[in-house]
Amino acid sequence: MPLAKEIPTPYVWSYQPQMGVPAGASQDYSTKINCLSAGPRMAQTVFALRDQRNRVLTAEAHGQTPRPVVNPASWPAAALSHEPPPPTLLTLPRNEPTEHAMTDAGYQIAGGAAPWSGVKTGSFCGRGLQLAEPPTTAIYPSGLFHLGRGQRLVLDHQPARTLLLESAPSVPRYGGIGARQFLKEFTPAVYPQPYSGPPNTFPDYFCFNYDSVSNSVDGYS
Protein backbone atom coordinates (compact mmCIF):
# COMPACT_ATOMS: atom_id res chain seq x y z
CA MET A 1 0.00 0.00 0.00
CA PRO A 2 1.69 3.25 -1.09
CA LEU A 3 0.30 5.30 1.75
CA ALA A 4 1.57 2.82 4.33
CA LYS A 5 5.02 2.79 2.71
CA GLU A 6 5.22 6.55 2.65
CA ILE A 7 4.18 7.23 6.24
CA PRO A 8 5.23 4.50 8.70
CA THR A 9 3.53 4.04 12.03
CA PRO A 10 5.56 3.96 15.23
CA TYR A 11 6.42 0.78 17.06
CA VAL A 12 5.26 0.80 20.67
CA TRP A 13 7.11 -1.28 23.23
CA SER A 14 5.37 -3.68 25.61
CA TYR A 15 6.59 -4.65 29.07
CA GLN A 16 7.01 -8.05 30.69
CA PRO A 17 6.60 -7.34 34.43
CA GLN A 18 7.48 -10.85 35.67
CA MET A 19 10.97 -10.77 34.15
CA GLY A 20 11.42 -7.01 34.09
CA VAL A 21 12.29 -6.86 30.39
CA PRO A 22 10.65 -5.37 27.29
CA ALA A 23 8.54 -7.90 25.43
CA GLY A 24 9.17 -6.59 21.93
CA ALA A 25 7.44 -3.83 20.02
CA SER A 26 4.53 -3.79 17.62
CA GLN A 27 3.07 -1.21 15.28
CA ASP A 28 0.53 1.20 16.62
CA TYR A 29 -2.18 0.84 14.02
CA SER A 30 -4.42 3.27 15.85
CA THR A 31 -2.37 6.11 14.36
CA LYS A 32 -3.48 5.24 10.81
CA ILE A 33 -6.10 7.42 9.20
CA ASN A 34 -8.95 6.26 7.04
CA CYS A 35 -7.57 7.22 3.65
CA LEU A 36 -10.84 6.36 1.91
CA SER A 37 -12.78 9.12 3.67
CA ALA A 38 -9.99 11.69 3.75
CA GLY A 39 -9.51 14.08 0.86
CA PRO A 40 -6.11 14.74 -0.72
CA ARG A 41 -5.52 17.99 1.16
CA MET A 42 -6.49 16.50 4.52
CA ALA A 43 -4.39 13.41 3.86
CA GLN A 44 -1.31 15.48 3.03
CA THR A 45 -1.81 17.60 6.16
CA VAL A 46 -2.11 14.50 8.32
CA PHE A 47 0.94 12.99 6.62
CA ALA A 48 2.97 16.11 7.38
CA LEU A 49 1.94 16.02 11.05
CA ARG A 50 2.67 12.31 11.25
CA ASP A 51 6.08 12.79 9.65
CA GLN A 52 6.90 15.49 12.20
CA ARG A 53 5.73 13.21 15.00
CA ASN A 54 7.96 10.42 13.70
CA ARG A 55 10.96 12.74 13.75
CA VAL A 56 10.19 13.69 17.35
CA LEU A 57 9.81 10.04 18.37
CA THR A 58 13.05 9.13 16.62
CA ALA A 59 14.92 11.90 18.43
CA GLU A 60 13.44 10.76 21.75
CA ALA A 61 14.43 7.16 21.09
CA HIS A 62 18.03 8.18 20.41
CA GLY A 63 18.15 10.51 23.40
CA GLN A 64 16.41 8.35 25.99
CA THR A 65 18.09 5.09 24.99
CA PRO A 66 21.76 5.86 24.26
CA ARG A 67 22.81 2.19 24.40
CA PRO A 68 24.52 0.20 21.64
CA VAL A 69 21.91 -2.53 22.17
CA VAL A 70 18.41 -1.24 22.77
CA ASN A 71 17.11 -4.37 24.48
CA PRO A 72 20.07 -6.30 25.94
CA ALA A 73 19.71 -9.83 27.27
CA SER A 74 20.92 -8.88 30.75
CA TRP A 75 20.99 -5.57 32.52
CA PRO A 76 24.07 -4.78 34.61
CA ALA A 77 23.63 -2.85 37.81
CA ALA A 78 25.22 0.25 36.30
CA ALA A 79 22.46 0.46 33.68
CA LEU A 80 19.61 0.26 36.17
CA SER A 81 18.05 3.18 37.95
CA HIS A 82 18.31 2.65 41.70
CA GLU A 83 15.27 4.28 43.23
CA PRO A 84 15.11 4.25 47.02
CA PRO A 85 12.17 2.37 48.52
CA PRO A 86 9.34 4.45 49.94
CA PRO A 87 9.90 5.54 53.54
CA THR A 88 8.08 3.83 56.38
CA LEU A 89 6.15 6.01 58.79
CA LEU A 90 5.87 4.69 62.34
CA THR A 91 3.60 6.24 64.95
CA LEU A 92 5.33 6.48 68.30
CA PRO A 93 3.35 5.78 71.48
CA ARG A 94 2.67 8.72 73.73
CA ASN A 95 4.03 8.85 77.25
CA GLU A 96 1.12 10.48 79.02
CA PRO A 97 2.52 10.19 82.58
CA THR A 98 5.64 12.04 81.46
CA GLU A 99 3.58 14.75 79.77
CA HIS A 100 1.42 15.21 82.86
CA ALA A 101 4.48 15.38 85.06
CA MET A 102 6.11 17.96 82.82
CA THR A 103 2.96 20.07 82.87
CA ASP A 104 2.51 19.82 86.61
CA ALA A 105 6.16 20.72 87.11
CA GLY A 106 5.61 24.00 85.29
CA TYR A 107 7.82 23.69 82.24
CA GLN A 108 7.59 26.91 80.25
CA ILE A 109 9.32 27.91 77.03
CA ALA A 110 9.06 31.58 77.97
CA GLY A 111 7.49 33.46 80.77
CA GLY A 112 7.92 35.91 83.58
CA ALA A 113 5.87 34.56 86.40
CA ALA A 114 7.54 33.83 89.68
CA PRO A 115 8.98 30.34 89.95
CA TRP A 116 6.50 28.00 91.54
CA SER A 117 6.87 24.59 93.01
CA GLY A 118 5.66 21.77 90.90
CA VAL A 119 3.89 18.62 91.92
CA LYS A 120 6.34 15.82 92.58
CA THR A 121 5.40 12.74 90.56
CA GLY A 122 7.93 9.97 90.52
CA SER A 123 11.28 11.32 89.41
CA PHE A 124 9.82 14.47 87.85
CA CYS A 125 10.11 17.43 90.11
CA GLY A 126 10.48 21.03 88.98
CA ARG A 127 10.24 24.61 90.01
CA GLY A 128 9.54 26.01 86.57
CA LEU A 129 11.75 27.11 83.73
CA GLN A 130 11.35 30.68 82.55
CA LEU A 131 13.24 32.37 79.78
CA ALA A 132 11.65 35.73 79.07
CA GLU A 133 8.88 38.15 79.96
CA PRO A 134 5.87 37.99 80.04
CA PRO A 135 4.23 34.59 80.74
CA THR A 136 3.88 32.97 77.37
CA THR A 137 3.76 29.23 76.96
CA ALA A 138 3.52 25.94 78.75
CA ILE A 139 3.41 22.43 77.40
CA TYR A 140 0.10 20.68 77.94
CA PRO A 141 -0.58 16.93 77.90
CA SER A 142 -2.45 17.30 74.63
CA GLY A 143 0.80 18.10 72.90
CA LEU A 144 -0.29 21.67 72.16
CA PHE A 145 1.44 24.86 73.17
CA HIS A 146 -0.59 27.11 75.41
CA LEU A 147 0.01 30.82 75.10
CA GLY A 148 -0.35 33.24 77.96
CA ARG A 149 -3.38 35.52 78.40
CA GLY A 150 -5.86 32.93 77.27
CA GLN A 151 -4.43 32.33 73.81
CA ARG A 152 -3.53 28.95 72.43
CA LEU A 153 -1.23 28.16 69.55
CA VAL A 154 -2.17 24.94 67.82
CA LEU A 155 0.89 23.37 66.23
CA ASP A 156 1.21 20.21 64.24
CA HIS A 157 2.66 17.91 66.87
CA GLN A 158 2.51 14.82 64.68
CA PRO A 159 6.22 14.95 63.69
CA ALA A 160 7.14 14.60 67.35
CA ARG A 161 5.04 11.45 67.60
CA THR A 162 6.10 9.81 64.35
CA LEU A 163 9.30 8.26 63.10
CA LEU A 164 10.24 8.25 59.43
CA LEU A 165 12.41 5.31 58.42
CA GLU A 166 14.24 5.37 55.10
CA SER A 167 16.30 2.46 53.83
CA ALA A 168 18.37 1.65 50.79
CA PRO A 169 19.66 -1.67 49.46
CA SER A 170 23.20 -2.55 50.44
CA VAL A 171 23.75 -4.44 47.16
CA PRO A 172 23.01 -2.77 43.79
CA ARG A 173 20.00 -4.21 42.03
CA TYR A 174 20.64 -6.21 38.86
CA GLY A 175 18.62 -8.24 36.40
CA GLY A 176 15.43 -6.74 35.01
CA ILE A 177 14.39 -3.13 34.81
CA GLY A 178 11.49 -1.56 36.62
CA ALA A 179 8.28 -0.30 35.07
CA ARG A 180 9.25 3.35 35.63
CA GLN A 181 12.60 2.95 33.87
CA PHE A 182 10.87 1.07 31.04
CA LEU A 183 8.43 3.93 30.46
CA LYS A 184 11.26 6.45 30.56
CA GLU A 185 13.73 4.75 28.21
CA PHE A 186 11.65 2.64 25.83
CA THR A 187 9.85 5.35 23.92
CA PRO A 188 7.98 4.56 20.69
CA ALA A 189 10.39 3.92 17.82
CA VAL A 190 9.90 4.45 14.10
CA TYR A 191 10.98 1.98 11.43
CA PRO A 192 11.03 3.97 8.17
CA GLN A 193 10.08 1.16 5.76
CA PRO A 194 7.95 -1.40 7.57
CA TYR A 195 6.58 -2.98 4.37
CA SER A 196 8.96 -2.19 1.52
CA GLY A 197 12.33 -2.41 3.30
CA PRO A 198 14.58 -5.46 2.91
CA PRO A 199 14.29 -8.11 5.64
CA ASN A 200 17.86 -7.65 6.83
CA THR A 201 17.16 -4.04 7.78
CA PHE A 202 14.25 -4.84 10.11
CA PRO A 203 15.23 -4.27 13.74
CA ASP A 204 15.13 -7.76 15.22
CA TYR A 205 15.01 -6.38 18.76
CA PHE A 206 11.39 -5.45 18.07
CA CYS A 207 10.59 -9.20 18.20
CA PHE A 208 9.68 -10.46 21.66
CA ASN A 209 11.78 -13.64 21.22
CA TYR A 210 14.91 -11.88 19.98
CA ASP A 211 18.17 -13.07 21.57
CA SER A 212 20.79 -10.33 21.64
CA VAL A 213 23.54 -12.80 22.61
CA SER A 214 23.21 -14.88 19.45
CA ASN A 215 21.78 -11.95 17.46
CA SER A 216 18.94 -14.12 16.21
CA VAL A 217 15.22 -14.59 16.65
CA ASP A 218 14.14 -17.85 18.22
CA GLY A 219 12.58 -20.08 15.60
CA TYR A 220 14.16 -18.33 12.63
CA SER A 221 17.48 -19.00 11.00
From Swiss-Prot:
Phosphothreonine: residues carrying this PTM: 65
Induction line: Expressed in the late phase of the viral replicative cycle.
Any one GO MF annotation of this record: hexon binding
A Pfam match: Adeno_PVIII
Modifications made to the protein after synthesis: Cleaved by the viral protease during virion maturation. May cause the middle segment to be shed from the capsid.
Pro-peptide positions on chain: 113-150
Alphabetized UniProt keyword annotations: Capsid protein, Host nucleus, Late protein, Phosphoprotein, Virion
Transmembrane segments: none
A single GO cellular-component term on record: viral capsid
UniProt-annotated site: Cleavage, residues: 112-113, 150-151
Domain of life the protein comes from: Viruses
HAMAP family: ADV_CAP8
Misc remark: All late proteins expressed from the major late promoter are produced by alternative splicing and alternative polyadenylation of the same gene giving rise to non-overlapping ORFs. A leader sequence is present in the N-terminus of all these mRNAs and is recognized by the viral shutoff protein to provide expression although conventional translation via ribosome scanning from the cap has been shut off in the host cell.
Quaternary structure and interacting proteins, as annotated: Interacts with the peripentonal hexons as well as the hexons in the facets. Part of a complex composed of the core-capsid bridging protein, the endosome lysis protein VI and the hexon-linking protein VIII; these interactions bridge the virus core to the capsid.
Recorded family membership: Belongs to the adenoviridae hexon-linking protein family.
Protein name per Swiss-Prot or TrEMBL: Pre-hexon-linking protein VIII
